Design a protein with these regions (language model features):
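Structural preference for beta-strand elements that scaffold enzyme active sites
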Residues: 9-13, 40-46, 82-84, 101-102, ...
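Catalytic beta/alpha-barrel core
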Residues: 63-64, 78-92, 101-114, 125-136, ...
């Protein structure tokens, strides 16, 4: 991946679930950049400019598309790092591509051909999250849609598989299975711990297992990790129940670098 410097480490996509404001985004980016620089981890800042897929109609969706995208552009410029955001509609692809380096396809949308093709045609790296309903082997077809549209800058992300009602499980056999397609494979260490569609209308999670999933991902040879992190997850406007507190990030990454070095 030309986006990242050469390193023997995994790369990291990390940041808040959604852009809540400029000051917070800059603080989180600053801390993540400092930590990953010290640990020699290639890093891209993640932040959704809009959350289109929410449980309830009154759930927070964003501060405004253009405003959020301009914040992502500021992070990109001031820290000199790649930036990733989700897109949900074909028209989002061209709009977001002006501000970010990686366009992320949400898991629920990973089979949407027109969306994948629109993302591909921007020339940006496309990170496709594996649907909770798909076998790893099926992701070759999502990747092929992007490649056939003329873009081979592709990443695939494991984010858990539906396990009965309101639960997900990560099958780590899927990492080497997807790596066979020739693209970097990322493990989403926070969304894979969601407890979706709770009766309250707010998605739950098991953040106490983030370290477990992260260690397993590195041990099995994942190319990259995806983590959502926040200064105070309890007050986050989206996905707070499965985010990593920002003050725990350095300790966790330090352990993961040691595991990677032992392989």
């Amino acid at each position: 991946m030309a986006l990242f410097k050469d390193s023997s480490n995994f790369f990291l996509l990390a940041g808040p679930c959604v852009i809540e404001g400029e000051d917070m985004a800059m603080r989180i980016a600053d801390k993540c950049v400092n930590i990953t620089s010290r640990l020699d981890i290639p890093y891209a800042f993640k932040g959704s400019f809009k959350k289109a897929n929410r449980s309830r109609i009154d759930s927070f969706t964003g501060i405004g598309d253009e405003k959020a995208l301009k914040i992502l552009a500021r992070v990109r410029k001031e820290f000199g790092i790649p930036v990733v955001t989700d897109i949900h509609r074909e028209e989002d692809a061209v709009m977001a591509a002006e501000y970010v380096d990686i366009l992320q396809i949400p898991a629920f949308l990973c089979r949407q051909t027109d969306l994948l093709v629109a993302a591909a045609r921007t020339g940006k790296t496309v990170n496709i999250k594996k649907g909770q309903f798909l076998a790893p082997d099926a992701m070759q077809f999502a990747a092929q849609k992007v490649a056939d549209a003329g873009n081979k800058n592709i990443m695939l992300t494991e984010r858990g598989t539906t396990f009965g009602y309101q639960d997900l499980v990560v099958d780590f056999r899927g990492i080497p299975e997807m790596q066979r397609f020739g693209y970097p494979v990322v493990v989403d260490c926070t969304h894979s711990l969601q407890r979706p569609n709770q009766t309250s209308g707010v998605t739950g999670g098991q953040p106490e297992l983030i370290e477990t999933i992260s260690k397993a991902a590195v041990a099995v040879g994942a190319d990259g990790l995806f983590m959502e992190t926040h200064e105070n997850p309890a007050e986050a406007k989206s996905d707070g129940a499965n985010m990593l507190p920002l003050d725990l990030l350095e300790g966790l990454l330090t352990k993961l670098v040691r595991i990677r070095a032992a392989l």
